[in-house]
């Protein structure tokens, strides 16, 4: 039989601080999206097309859709964001929330857009490509 974990007040405060710092980083990342949404959308769209992960008839249309996604992210509440990223939460060990949300958008919504021919690569490949651009434009 396993040992029952009963945290002391010190352990509880440490766990609470860790959890609140994660939430703070999440809120900071979402708020930074407003400041750099246009160059970020351009960077993500360009990289997705260059790496042949997304085949599209119009790169500008892809960029506009990602820009709309980023603008929507900055206005959503926590529940809606969590609901959108839930299927992809275990994609990588410590996902960046903006990258995860855009990945979910590309995989679930963008596939049905009229200008997108097809989406290639694994979910992880798409996440890593998007995360590379998010880190470039939004260093935390």
Question: Residue locations for each model-derived region?
Answer:
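Internal, charge-rich low-complexity segments
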Residues: 2-140
């Amino acid at each position: 039989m396993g040992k029952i974990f009963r945290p002391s007040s010190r352990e509880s405060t440490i766990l609470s601080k860790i959890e609140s710092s994660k939430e703070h980083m999440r809120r900071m990342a979402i708020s930074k999206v407003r400041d750099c949404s246009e160059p970020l959308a351009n960077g993500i769209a360009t990289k997705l097309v260059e790496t042949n992960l997304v085949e599209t008839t119009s790169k500008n249309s892809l960029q506009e859709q990602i820009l709309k996604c980023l603008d929507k992210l900055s206005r959503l509440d926590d529940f809606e964001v969590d609901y959108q990223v839930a299927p992809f939460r275990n994609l990588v060990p410590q996902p960046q929330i903006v990258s995860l949300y855009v990945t979910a958008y590309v995989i679930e919504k963008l596939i049905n857009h009229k200008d997108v021919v097809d989406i290639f690569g694994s979910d992880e490949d798409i996440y890593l490509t998007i995360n590379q651009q998010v880190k470039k434009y939004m260093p935390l």
